[in-house]
Amino acid sequence: DGNAEYFEIHKASYFDSDTQTISLGNGYACEANFSQEMPEWNLNSKKTREEFTKIAKFWIDRGVDGFRLDACKYFTNKETDGTEFLKWFYDTCKGIKEDVYMVGENWTDDSDIQELYKSGIDSQFAFKFSTSTGTIISNIISQGGMATAKKIMNYDNKMTESNPNAINAMFLSNHDQVRSGNALESQ
């Protein structure tokens, strides 16, 4: 139908055994790490990037000041350098609106987050500090304010090594997690 170039479609044997895919028949599959209903974009495709540019421009022209990018860790696969793509998209949006703000959701370890900060992106959510068992709430409950401050400062220093302008996005919880109020209500 002419849309195959937009997605990560390959011979099924191309994918690693732990990669989630959607079988397309005739020996082909489409990468779908997040959900069987959500195929992965081919982020190396010129057509895909043209569409991303049009979509960003559409929303920026209507007054949107920034973007929250869901599941950034899936921007990287066998043939896609997630940092390169993120840099391209960030620079593209900055070309449309100089002061656009971009925050990435990246449920992964510090080294992956640090790598994506090399793209220049403004912020990434600091998941290790969130949830009822994360650093912030745990230390609020135990009254460990100084320990929390030191952990956040060390994290911030580590991330700004990759991007001196990084604004780490600390938060307590989001729509994918148990709400922070549940952890604090008994305190």
Language-model segments: what does each one mean?
Residues 172:
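Conserved N-terminal catalytic/coupling substructures associated with nucleotide/phosphate chemistry
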